[in-house]
Regions:
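N-terminal catalytic cores of secreted or lumenal carbohydrate-active enzymes
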Residues: 1-77, 108
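Generic low-polarity alpha-helical segments
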Residues: 4-8, 166, 254
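Substrate-binding and catalytic surfaces of secreted/luminal carbohydrate-active proteins
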Residues: 31, 61-68, 73-78, 89-253
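Short, conserved phosphate-binding/catalytic loop or strand-edge motifs used
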Residues: 82-88
Length: 254
């Protein structure tokens, strides 16, 4: 990890996060990667592929370095997920990670690395749709992995929000998060407001979630910036055009 650097983030991301924290120091920051560096992956590509088992330990150290580097900038990473949407290998970037692979990574590499470095950042598993409650349950059914895990995270592009209750019933001592749902450029304001309040805000809380996140916070009128192949119609809570900010439906959902 001799080339590890946050230099790309110091221009925009880190200054914005510091401004947010200055306005509200109680804000919690969660990190969820789309992909490891491509040299750690089976296909040496930003799209899809798996994390090579021989790189599990170095990727765990990558998380450690990231959390420590952000802390040096005054930003505490409250929680991380090992992988955003680990069953979605078509995005650019993305990574496919099975429940067995995530279990191995957490119990044998990430958890021990955090422990050795004295890092208290929470580890949250799954971070994908409500159609697969079996995925986080499989991880939590492994006692060695469970010892390092704070909870499970969900999205609702597939499945039913009651999946959170299934995980709660299997492991009531672990937290539940709802970490992503987007509103689209072609959707109606009233339709999105009704659906998100019913499912994302009320529905998740009635199914044991302590967190409900809208995605994303802000973008420009062309729904950028985004990665090549990234979402071209995901609307921010606010649209930024020059010095003007327009509030969108996610602003009112939040």
């Amino acid at each position: 990890l001799q080339q590890f650097s946050l230099s790309r983030d110091t221009s925009h991301l880190i200054p914005v996060l510091k401004e947010i924290l200055a306005l509200n120091p109680a804000i919690k920051i969660m990190g969820s990667p789309w992909s490891p560096p491509v040299w750690m992956k089976s296909n040496k590509n930003s799209v899809g592929g798996n994390l090579n088992p021989q790189h599990y330990s170095v990727y765990a150290q990558y998380f450690v370095r990231y959390i420590q580097a952000m802390k040096a900038h005054g930003i505490t990473i409250d929680a991380i997920t090992p992988q955003n949407e680990p069953q979605h290998g078509g995005n650019n970037p993305s990574l496919v990670m099975s429940a067995a692979q995530q279990t191995d990574f957490i119990k044998n590499h990430l958890g021990p690395a955090f422990q050795a470095a004295g890092i208290n950042t929470k580890i949250v598993v799954w971070d994908h749709n409500c159609n697969r409650p079996d995925y986080p349950i499989a991880i939590l059914d492994d006692p060695a992995a469970k010892a390092f895990v704070h909870g499970s995270a969900f999205h609702l592009y597939e499945g039913d929000v009651s999946a959170l209750t299934q995980v709660h019933q299997a492991h009531p001592d672990k937290a539940l998060y709802f970490t992503e749902q987007w509103t689209g450029s072609n959707s109606s304001f009233d339709g999105d407001l009704k659906w998100h309040i019913k499912n994302v805000i009320i529905g998740t809380m009635r199914n044991w979630s302590g967190v409900a996140l809208e995605w994303n916070l802000a973008n420009d009128p062309a729904f950028g910036p985004h990665t090549p192949g990234g979402c071209t119609q995901c609307k921010g809570a606010v649209t930024i055009e020059g010095s003007n900010a327009t509030k969108n439906v996610s602003y009112y959902i939040i």
